[in-house]
Regions:
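N-terminal and secondary-structure boundary signal
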Residues: 9, 13-274
Length: 274
């Protein structure tokens, strides 16, 4: 029997999670998405066009925009009547009061404001700028681009589960789905891709209690694995006019399991930035 040492347990853990490569491939021929489009059908067709055959434990990463568009989350600002509070905040932040009204509707709490930005606790629980509402690459048929904005999906975890289930039925493969968006961070400049909807892969990987390379027991290490993958996929998607909103991932170094976004949201009592 092998000795039950910290070093031997470390070797077992590393071998289990060791990956020769992590491969991210943008899917081709994804059309401009409209309301009520069947994303599962579109993605399966794109996989075929991209000459990718799904395997068990593959992951598909979707840009939030195509999910929101398919779910009808585009809002024409002509239909929005701003409240008194929205009008006041709009003056302070130099924003369109109609957009500010939507931010208030999408948020639990306004945390910070300055000209050009409103920081909120989104109704989904995370902190973000402008409630995740987007003007770019949003248009309605026959209307000015500037009159339309796009809200985040109502329940991104549910959207991810539905997408995962539909694609698994169509392909017979066990996969994960990640829906991502671009967010800033309180302590760094620049936006990065983060997970906002998860199905079939871990949000967090808890390494506490596992040995490190030298056999010492880790005490605090928890990896935001879904956010790490989201950032990698965001590099492939780009932030402007690249038109590659779905990324196929092979070689994710952790076992797939059921999870939800709340794994990644820090409780308020532990949030030192509020």
């Amino acid at each position: 029997m092998a000795p039950n040492t910290r070093a031997s347990r470390s070797r077992v853990f590393r071998a289990k999670n060791k990956v020769s490569s992590l491969i991210l491939t943008p899917l081709i021929n994804i059309p401009l998405i409209r309301r009520d489009d069947n994303l599962a059908d579109i993605i399966v067709a794109s996989l075929q066009d991209s000459r990718i055959t799904l395997e068990d434990d593959d992951i598909l990463v979707l840009a939030q925009k195509i999910v929101s568009k398919a779910e009808g989350r585009a809002i024409n600002l002509v239909t929005v009547t701003p409240s008194a509070r929205a009008i006041e905040l709009a003056k302070q932040t130099e924003k369109d009061p109609r957009v500010v009204e939507l931010m208030l509707q999408e948020s639990n709490e306004v945390l910070r404001t300055r000209p050009g930005a409103i920081i909120v606790e989104h109704r989904l629980g995370f902190v973000c700028a402008n409630a995740g509402i987007d003007h770019s690459n949003v248009a309605g048929a026959g209307d000015s681009v500037e009159e339309w904005v796009l809200l985040l999906p109502t329940d991104p975890d549910r959207s991810a589960r539905k997408m995962r289930d539909e694609i698994q039925v169509k392909t017979g493969k066990r996969i994960g789905i990640l829906i991502i968006d671009s967010h800033g961070r309180a302590w760094r400049n620049g936006t990065v891709g983060i997970a906002i909807g998860i199905a079939g892969l871990p949000g967090m990987v808890d390494l506490r209690g596992h040995p490190d390379l030298f056999g010492y027991t880790l005490r605090v290490t928890q990896i935001g694995a879904a956010d790490e993958l989201a950032a990698a996929a965001s590099l492939m998607m780009g932030q402007a006019a690249e038109g590659t909103p779905v990324i196929h991932v092979r070689g994710f170094p952790y076992e797939l399991r059921e999870a939800a976004l709340n794994e990644l949201i820090r409780p308020k009592e532990q949030d030192l930035f509020r």
